[in-house]
């Protein structure tokens, strides 16, 4: 999120094996051996969008998603933070990135959901439901 309440999304590289050239969460990745979810989140923020250790201290856990078909059988921890950029995008992973309002994301999903990685749409909808409760 930025200070205007817009969410930064990455446009996945055309070289990605799964869901190339789709909009996805700001950062994502897998645990390395011996790492916990928080440590992996920090590592991915550094690798994918170039935030340093001092900038990543503001992340906070939101919720956990159990493995399911919608997450390709992966366990997911969702974290969030506020940062206005700029970001240094990892070219091998990300072709583009920009901030979107919640309304714009909803409209884009409604009009053309295939422009998003399927797991993003699933987790986005879980997030919106949680915010309403």
Predicted regions and their residues:
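Conserved Nudix-box catalytic region and its N-terminal flanking loop in Nudix hydrolases
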Residues: 3-43, 47
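Short acidic/polar alpha-helix capping motifs at helix-coil junctions
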Residues: 8-10, 26, 48-51, 70-71, ...
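A short coil-to-beta-strand element that immediately follows conserved catalytic motifs
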Residues: 52-62
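Active-site beta-strand termini and strand-to-loop segments that position acidic
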Residues: 1-3, 81-82
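Nudix hydrolase/Nudix homology domain
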Residues: 21-23, 61-66, 70-133
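Alpha-helix capping at helix-to-loop junctions
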Residues: 46-54, 67, 84
